[in-house]
Every structure is written in C-alpha cells, then in structure tokens.
Amino acid sequence: MRKVVFFHNNVSRVATDPRDLLSRFHNYLQAAKDYLGNPNLELNLLLGRIDSSIRFDAIKVVRLSRSLLSQYLALRSSLKRPGEQVTLIAGDNHLSLLICLFAKARKTNIRLQISIHTSVNTLLNPSNISGKLKLKFILLSVGFVDNIRVVSDSDLENLRKAITYFDGQIFVAPVPIEIPKAALDRKHSHVLGMVGRLHPERGVAECPAIFEELRVVRPKSEILLIGDGAERAWLEKKLSGFEPRPEFTGSLKQSDIRDRWPQIHVLLSCAPSESYGMALREALVNGVFVVARKNKTTELLQAQFPSVMKVFTNPSEAAIFINSFFEQKFFPDMIIAVRQAIKSEQDKHLIQLAKSWFV
C-alpha cells in the first residue's frame, strides 16, 4: 500500500472548520480500511496554522510552523524514505500546491494529487483578476500533477474538455455527507432555511424577492440563514422589516448545522450553479424539502428525488414550490429511500478515493 500524505500550509484559510476537516479525513481513512480490508492504514496530515486548542487523537497530524521554508523541509522529511511509494495530496490553495510541486521535483515514487472542490465551469470562466490568475496557475501546474479529484460528473466532463493534454487520471469523489442512521419522524415546522456562504455567486440577491412573495401567501413563515459572507450585511438590511425577524446564525460547525436540520421544513438554494450540491443532499437525508434554482446539478437531483425537491426559474415559482412543501410532510419511508440512494452513490465515490490514495 502507498503512504498517503496530505499537505496544507494554512488551514486557517479553509472555509471548513478545522475540526470538521479532521473528522472528514478520519471518515476517509475508515472507509479505505473497510474497503481494502487493512486496519493498519494511516493518513499523514501536515497542517499549517492549525489552532493549538484543536485535538486530534483519531488521526496522525503534524503541526507546521508559519515559516514556508520550515513547512517545505517538514514535507520533504516526510517523503525521504528511499523507494517508498507515496501519494501526496496538495491542499486547495496556491502555496500548498507550489510547495508540493517543489517537494515532488523529479521524484518518480511520488504521485501528486490535487482536488477541485469548486465548480469547474466557474473556475474556467473567472470574473475577476484573482480568478484569472488562479486559473492560469492551475493550468500551468497540471502538467506536473498525476491525479485530479473533482466533485461531479459535469465537472469531470468540463475539465477533460479544457485540459485535453492531461494524461493523468481525473476522477469524481465529492466530499461525503453524514447520513443519519436513526429513524426520523419529522415534526411540521414553518421554517425556511438557507445553508451556505452568503456570497454574490450563490445568488443571494434573489432571496429578498422570494421571501417577499412567500410572506404574502404565508405570513407566519420563519427564515433561518446559516452561513456568513460578503452579502450578509446587505441581506440583513433588506430583511430588516420582516416579521417574524429572520435569524442569522453566521458560520457554524457541521455538528451545529446537524442540530439545526430538525427545525427546517424547506431548504432554499438560489445558486445559479452547483458543483455537487452538498447542502442540498444534507437537507434531503435529514428529511428537509428542497427548492433550488434550476441548473445542471439541481435538475439531476430533482429527477432523482422528484417528490421532495423542485427547481425554479424565477422568484414567484420558488415561492409557490416553498408554500406547497409547507403543506406536505416528509414521511419516514421517503427519508429511507433518499438515504439509501445517496449512501449507495457515496460509497462508490469513497471506494474510488481509497483506490486513488492507497493503491
């Protein structure tokens, strides 16, 4: 089996809470152990800027200093055993990838993997200078990369078209979600939720119009917004006259979000494009109806789960679907069917990820 090393020079810049990130890697490792039948498999995480208060007993983690040179030397040290076959996974920022490229250099025993967690279509069509520079760097780097992980079939297709010269492996393995095992008999609520970053690219500007239309037909509906971002202040101002007053929680850890799902009856997503739709799937496995803007990903999800998810093309349509779901109940047998379908899909992707790392 190959040695697997994940390197990120600054996890404080990652949108995911570090505790959730560590938990995610622990789940990856457990899935690999189960699939490969090897309880002795290890993951080696080299992480910079990780808070000293964070503990990690279940997985092997090396804290890195702030010095980029020290980080590079620590990474080289972890790769120095002669003849050892290594899979080196670069964190999803420029510096992490650059340091990994230097560490790999001309070593043929190191397989370098990168992950693209964002929409490939968005990545390939940047709207600002920062995005254009990021795209340029990635396109220059892929010639030195062996594997690329993306999160959806559409991303796989778009990336293959963009880098026809790439002769490595591109595969699909989205971030897995936690699928509850307990039976769920949901209580009816009047809460419409949004979960995710409050950024322009998430279609936040459309939300007030939807909320206004919903308030006309269902004045007692409540709004819960979980997440933070550049548009939060604007959205709070636009919704300041709403009664009941919308609740803004800010960013929450995954464990805290899980505690909130039972409150929410319908999840709204206004994102014009979705790479995988992680929050949409989390809602569905927790018995929450979903109303989402029409795009390639949401259309596929609606086709898979037509009785519990609807896609919209304008605010009026969204409000109609939301109001309709408020009249319905997400029955236990529906939840079981959704969970089974998503788990089957997820297990297939975890096996693919385990193969790319350890085999």
Show where each model-derived region lies.
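A charged, aromatic-enriched C-terminal amphipathic alpha-helix characteristic of glycosyltransferases
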Residues: 313-316, 327-359
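Membrane-proximal helix-turn-helix segments that form the acceptor-binding/catalytic region
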Residues: 29, 130-148
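A short, active-site helix/loop in glycosyltransferases that binds the activated sugar's phosphate group
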Residues: 143-169
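A conserved mid-protein helix/loop that constitutes part of the nucleotide-sugar donor-binding site
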Residues: 19-30, 194-213, 230-233
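Nucleotide-activated donor-binding/catalytic signature segment of Leloir-type glycosyltransferases, i.e.
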Residues: 236-252
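Short alpha-helical donor nucleotide-sugar binding micro-motif in glycosyltransferases
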Residues: 251-252, 259-264
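Short His-centered aromatic/hydrophobic patch
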Residues: 90-96, 116
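Aromatic "clamp/platform" in nucleotide-sugar-dependent glycosyltransferases that forms part
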Residues: 272
